Amino acid sequence: MTEVEKYIAQFEPSIQEKLHALRATFYDVLPHTQESIRYKMPAFTVGKHHLYFAAYKKHIGFYPVYGLTEIEHEIAPFRAPKTKDSLHFKLDKPLPLELIRKIILSKSLQMQ
């Protein structure tokens, strides 16, 4: 079991399902990415940079998400209060996987 799999396994099944879907989306968009745990959360390597996600009591956080003006209107509803670079996906709502796919692709192009 990888460190990311161990991270996901600590949560209840409904949250695990969302985290597995998010992880799979990273690999769909970036099949050669490498995953690790950094800052106590799953991290996916993009060039010399990383994209992260983490589960919390009421949401899944996704970081860093800035500089994507072309899709900001889609991202805005998920912007975390008082931050410029993180998104919060509420646990009681479906994950917007198509939007997450766009974000990963856009950030990967930006981070190369």
Predicted segments, located by residue:
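Charge-dense, helix-prone N-terminal extensions
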Residues: 1-112
